[in-house]
Amino acid sequence: MNNQITVATLNGKSYYKIINFLKSIELSYNELSPIEAINSGTKVIITSEKESTIFKKKNIIIDSELNENPLIIKAKILRNLTEPFMYEQLIIGIDPGKRIGISIFYLYDEIESIVLTCIECVLNLVCKILTNLNAKRKIVRIGDGDRSMANSIAINIKTRFK
């Protein structure tokens, strides 16, 4: 993936923000000037809003978009990196209990694995992901570690999407 994501900005603040973001979500990247990036074969270019006007490609991410949920941005980047014919599938696995485990797979890659202790936090995260990620098929699987909590989570998710 190293040559598929390019940071293309001459703006110091934008550069710092972009590379810190990419490091935090553990994605590798190339660094090019905006002019060099125009002719590169990279699939995703991340740049500042001002410099984005020189690019005609559609796979541009502007540094201001990085303020969104990092999980959503990582998923958008991965989607731009995959082949168009790849089956678009989002799977969210939830393991209820005192500590609620969540594992999220998007386009066959695990993009997040997290443990939360608050049901409301779980519901907010799951609903945000289901709302913001495009996939032809979205699956939420809930384990039966704590059956009453599993039922509560299932009912809450179902009612939020009716």
Locations of the language-model features?
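Phosphate- and other anionic-substrate recognition elements at nucleic-acid/protein interfaces
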Residues: 1-31, 37-72, 76-92, 98-162
